[in-house]
Amino acid sequence: MSDNKKQQALELALKQIEKQFGKGSIMKLGDGADHSIEAIPSGSIALDIALGIGGYPRGRIIEVYGPESSGKTTLTLHAMASAQKQGGTVAFIDAEHALDPNYAKALGVDIDNLVLSQPDTGEQALDIAEALIKSGSIDMIVIDSVAALVPEAEIAGDMSANHVGLQARMMSQAMRKMSGVISKSNVVAIFINQIREKVGVMFGNPETTPGGRALKFFSSVRLEIRRAEAIKQGSEMIGIKSNVKVVKSKVAPPLKTASIDIMYGTGISRSGEVLDLSVELNLVNKSGAWYNIGEEKLGQGRDNAKQYLEDKPELLNELEKKVRTHFKLTK
């Protein structure tokens, strides 16, 4: 078969697969993202770029997972604040009973208008989530976390009783019921998940996420967030650098990574993201340890350059605007 005929046959096969399994079920890694999909910005410029469509896709299920203290909740709080800034209504299902209102407020969440539920059981949490989504009144719902969605039978049962597979069955049923409703209501549904170790795995990756396989399958986007290093000021630890990898995406080519600075008390560092992306686009020159724009020196070392931008909000805004224009991102 000639190269031309092979290409035609491949295009035909791709069209048939998309027709049968839906748009985004198959794509070439070099293909552009589907920009017709409406998205809510994630609150991180670097992550919006990695996601390919400028944020979290509406009408889809998103899974954010990672080890403890890697920044999962911070990432979702920024997304919630972003949805509210666009005039949207946000619901937070706090199955872990661990939401810190003061921290949420510091990250820009309007806690007075946040719809909050702290359910007693997993079934109750998912029923409340389904009812809110069906109402068509919310734009984003966050479930924190899948690991904390404990089935009622497990709570009511004896501590020594065997409850293998209960949570997986509960999640599987919930995903089947909710996926269609989420799509019709155009809501962004974010499930936060933890990482567990599989017992007895000798080869391959021993890590897995709780809740069975249903969430993996039904998610249009899966984000893995991992802590890379500590950010220190002298001997004091003031934040962490985390890497967010787009492990799965049905709306854009996956496997892209965003590196973000999470500062304690204030969340994702806007100046850090703008600085790194400005260097990448040659808007800021980096020579050795020095950062400069033409004759204007921003500072020696990344931390000093970040501080310079924070002290000059006009310059920071100007650079951010240029970065957003280049990557076709909305505010």
UniProtKB/Swiss-Prot annotation:
GO cellular component: cytosol
UniProt keyword Lipid biosynthesis present: no
Molecular-function annotations in GO: ATP binding; ATP hydrolysis activity; ATP-dependent DNA damage sensor activity; damaged DNA binding; single-stranded DNA binding
Pfam families tied to this protein: RecA, RecA_C
Compartment list: Cytoplasm
Keyword DNA-binding: yes
Binding-site residues, ATP: G66, P67, E68, S69, S70, G71, K72, T73
Matching CDD domains: RecA (cd00983)
GO terms, biological process: DNA recombination; DNA repair; SOS response
Entry-linked InterPro entries: AAA+_ATPase, DNA_recomb/repair_RecA, DNA_recomb/repair_RecA_CS, P-loop_NTPase, RecA-like_C, RecA-like_N, RecA_ATP-bd, RecA_C_sf
Keywords carried by this UniProt record: ATP-binding, Cytoplasm, DNA damage, DNA recombination, DNA repair, DNA-binding, Nucleotide-binding, SOS response
NCBIfam families listed in its UniProt record: tigrfam_recA
Family: Belongs to the RecA family.
Function according to Swiss-Prot or TrEMBL: Can catalyze the hydrolysis of ATP in the presence of single-stranded DNA, the ATP-dependent uptake of single-stranded DNA by duplex DNA, and the ATP-dependent hybridization of homologous single-stranded DNAs. It interacts with LexA causing its activation and leading to its autocatalytic cleavage.
Protein name (Swiss-Prot/TrEMBL): Protein RecA
Organism encoding this protein: Acholeplasma laidlawii (strain PG-8A)
Phylogenetic lineage: Bacteria, Bacillati, Mycoplasmatota, Mollicutes, Acholeplasmatales
Gene: recA
